[in-house]
């Protein structure tokens, strides 16, 4: 019995099989995989959320370092 799930490529919508044989899953091809990577790299795709002030990260890390030293 073949229980391989059919999925749509998130880039082009082409039907493909979710299986270990598909090295590009969930994409249908290397081309679609690279298009997706390019969209993330150019920030046209991003995870929604609020921006983080880089200065607050430095301050937070410095506080943690000081606490670790004590």
From Swiss-Prot:
InterPro entries: DNA_gyrase_inhibitor_YacG (IPR005584), Znf_NHR/GATA (IPR013088). Zn(2+) binds at residues 9, 12, 28, 32. Pfam families: YacG. The keyword Translocase does not apply. The keyword Methyltransferase does not apply. It comes from the Bacteria. Keywords: Metal-binding, Zinc. GO terms for molecular function: DNA topoisomerase type II (double strand cut, ATP-hydrolyzing) inhibitor activity; zinc ion binding. Binds 1 zinc ion. Residues 43-70 are annotated as: Disordered. GO terms for biological process: regulation of DNA-templated transcription. Belongs to the DNA gyrase inhibitor YacG family. NCBIfam families: PRK00418.1 (NF001638). HAMAP family: DNA_gyrase_inhibitor_YacG (MF_00649). This is DNA gyrase inhibitor YacG.
